[in-house]
C-alpha cells in the first residue's frame, strides 16, 4: 500500500472516556468528524465504543455539523438482521465527488471486521476511542494470570484487545493496493 495515499489524523483534544462523556464532548467529537470529512467528499465509517455514545455523537453531528444537502448519515442498530446489514453496506456501493455518506457504527461490532468495501466505496474511517473493553470478571482473570507470569496483565487483558479492534476497524478502508 502506497503510504502517500494515507492520511493519519489524531485529535488529542477530545476523549471517549466514560466520565467525560456528555453533550460538550460529543459536540467536540462531531466537530472533528466534520473537519475530517470536509477535506474530501465520499463515504466514511465512524466507529464509537458503544451504542449510547454513538447516538450522542451522531445526534450532535446531525444537529449542528451536517450539511444535509451534501451529507447523508446512517447508523448501525442493535440486533440488525441480515437484510438490514446488507442495506447498510449497500449504501456504500455508490460514491460521489459532491456528496458524502457517514455511517456510524460500534467499534468491535459487525461492521468493524469482515466487510470488504473496496476502492471509493469507503474513503475514510474515523475511530473514536481506544476500544478498551469494559472491566469484567473474565478480563480480570486474564489480567491476574498475565500479571502472575511477570508481564503487564492489563496490557494483555485490555490494551491489546482494544487496539486490535481499532486496527480491524481502520483496516476497512484499505482493502486493495489501489485504495
Segment roles from a protein language model:
Residues 1-179:
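ASCE RecA-like P-loop NTPase motor cores
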Amino acid at each position: 500500500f502506497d503510504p502517500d495515499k494515507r492520511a493519519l489524523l489524531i485529535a488529542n483534544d477530545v476523549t471517549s472516556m466514560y466520565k467525560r462523556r456528555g453533550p460538550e464532548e460529543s459536540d467536540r467529537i462531531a466537530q472533528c468528524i466534520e473537519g475530517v470529512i470536509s477535506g474530501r467528499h465520499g463515504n466514511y465509517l465512524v466507529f464509537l465504543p458503544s451504542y449510547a455514545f454513538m447516538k450522542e455523537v451522531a445526534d450532535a453531528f446531525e444537529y449542528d455539523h451536517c450539511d444535509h444537502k451534501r451529507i447523508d448519515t446512517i447508523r448501525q442498530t442493535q440486533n440488525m438482521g441480515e437484510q438490514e446489514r446488507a442495506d447498510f453496506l449497500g449504501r456504500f456501493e455508490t460514491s460521489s465527488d459532491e456528496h458524502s455518506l457517514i455511517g456510524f457504527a460500534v467499534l468491535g461490532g459487525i461492521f468493524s471486521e469482515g466487510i470488504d468495501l473496496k476502492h471509493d466505496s469507503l474513503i475514510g474511517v474515523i475511530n473514536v476511542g481506544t476500544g478498551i473493553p469494559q472491566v469484567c470478571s473474565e478480563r480480570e482473570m486474564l489480567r491476574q494470570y498475565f500479571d502472575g507470569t511477570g508481564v503487564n496483565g492489563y496490557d494483555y487483558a485490555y490494551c491489546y484487545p482494544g487496539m486490535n479492534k481499532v486496527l480491524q476497524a481502520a483496516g476497512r478502508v484499505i482493502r486493495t493496493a489501489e485504495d
